[in-house]
Regions:
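Structural signature of hydrophobic alpha-helical transmembrane segments
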Residues: 1-10, 58-75, 125-140, 199-210, ...
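Transmembrane alpha-helices that form the ion-translocation and gating core
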Residues: 23, 45-46, 84, 88-153, ...
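Small-residue-rich segments of transmembrane alpha-helices in multi-pass membrane proteins
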Residues: 32-44, 96-110, 163-177, 232-246, ...
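Alpha-helical transmembrane segments and their lipid-water interface positions
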Residues: 35, 44, 48, 71-75, ...
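Membrane-interface alpha-helices at helix entry/exit sites of multi-pass transporters
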Residues: 90, 96, 153-175, 191-194, ...
Length: 358
């Protein structure tokens, strides 16, 4: 009962906050995140009044399943950006920019935090600095997609943005696995090249294969139904199914592996939109159906913020260095690579800024 009440409060409070933020011309995502902080355990939730907020992080965690499913819908929707007709126009540019800007962010953060280590070795170790550099490669697909949807943005910049955000996940998986493996080797003096390379490779290839197979099966099953409502229900069921299957872990050659729910659902959407003649209508319907779920996702994300970390000045300083270095890496990497592949000045100027959310 508490979880249902918190779910209702999160959605209602988030929607009401968007009306306030719209006066300042701020996106709904910002309103949802601020709402989450306000009704989270550190503000109104601290009062312990039922229906006023999340009294504990356990209550926030109780809604984590909604967040997982919301990410599945986001990835499914991003898959729609990989239509073959569109990839013929921007695919090469998106691939080059996507890889280079991610590597630039990794390099900038690694250098900045390693320098910080030499200044304060008692606070930040080199393995931790390297791991944070790998995390810097990723861009938040949920934030990007929701802002694009809200403002109905279209054009060359948007056409490049969403595929690049999608590629970030694959690049981030490899970068994190390699960086974390190096960091672990530095800590324990054990280095396994197989585990560093095999795990992300299996995760990426396995996720893409699972998503592609599911997209093919979904397309075949859609032809069995004549009702658009039933077809929509089938699409939604497959997204839930992929999110659930992505939680399965397995071992290959002694290496622990798993699936990436983002890549699985993204590939599901990519295959579905390219081979199913009904995909346009069904994906639009799925987007509308998932809108309340995305709102709850961002409110829960805000409620998960641990405000107690701001009481530790050194951690705040590390965070500031990380944000500045990552922002510089994303912006410079996107600008330089966009110029190298011949994008127009508008793309060169603004693409890096649009890749800052994490």
């Amino acid at each position: 009962m508490t979880a249902i009440l918190n779910l209702a409060v999160a959605l209602l409070a988030g929607l009401l906050m968007t009306r306030i933020f719209s006066r300042w011309h701020l996106p709904d995502v910002t309103a949802f995140l601020v709402t989450g902080v306000l009704i989270g355990p550190f503000v109104l939730g601290r009062l312990g009044i039922p229906g006023l907020g999340f009294a504990s992080y356990d209550q926030v965690e109780a809604l984590s399943m909604i967040s997982d499913v919301a990410m599945g819908f986001i990835a499914f929707s991003i898959g729609n950006e990989f239509r073959l007709s569109q990839l013929k126009k921007t695919g090469k540019q998106a691939m080059i920019i996507g890889v280079l800007q991610a590597l630039a962010a990794l390099a900038f953060v690694d250098v900045a935090l390693v320098i910080f280590h030499f200044l304060r070795p008692d606070v930040l170790s080199v393995p931790a600095a390297i791991t944070l550099g790998a995390i810097a490669t990723a861009t938040a697909p949920a934030t990007t997609l929701m802002v694009v949807r809200q403002y109905k943005a279209k054009g060359e910049l948007t056409d490049l943005l969403l595929p690049i955000v999608a590629l970030d996940d694959a690049v981030g998986l490899i970068a994190f696995a390699v960086s974390f493996g190096i960091a672990r080797a530095m800590d324990s003096a054990q280095f396994s090249l197989a585990s560093i390379l095999l795990s992300p490779l299996i995760e990426i290839v396995g996720s893409l294969l699972l998503g592609a197979l599911a997209g093919f099966v979904l397309t075949k099953l859609e032809t069995m139904f004549r009702s658009n409502s039933n077809r929509l229900s089938l699409s939604i069921a497959f997204i839930f199914l992929m999110v659930g299957l992505s939680a399965v872990d397995f071992t290959v050659a002694g290496v622990d592996c798993g699936f990436s729910p983002l890549l699985v659902c993204m590939m599901l959407g990519t295959v579905f939109c390219n081979i199913c003649p009904l995909s346009d209508d069904l994906m639009n319907r799925a987007d509308k159906w998932s809108t309340p779920m995305l709102a709850v996702f961002f409110v829960v994300s805000g409620a998960n913020l641990r405000l107690s970390v701001f009481s530790q000045g050194v951690l705040v300083l590390i965070g500031v260095v990380y944000i500045i270095a990552r922002s510089a890496g994303k912006y410079c990497g996107a600008r330089w690579s966009a110029k190298a592949v011949g994008c127009d000045h508008t793309v060169q100027k603004y693409l890096g800024i649009m890749l800052l959310p994490q």
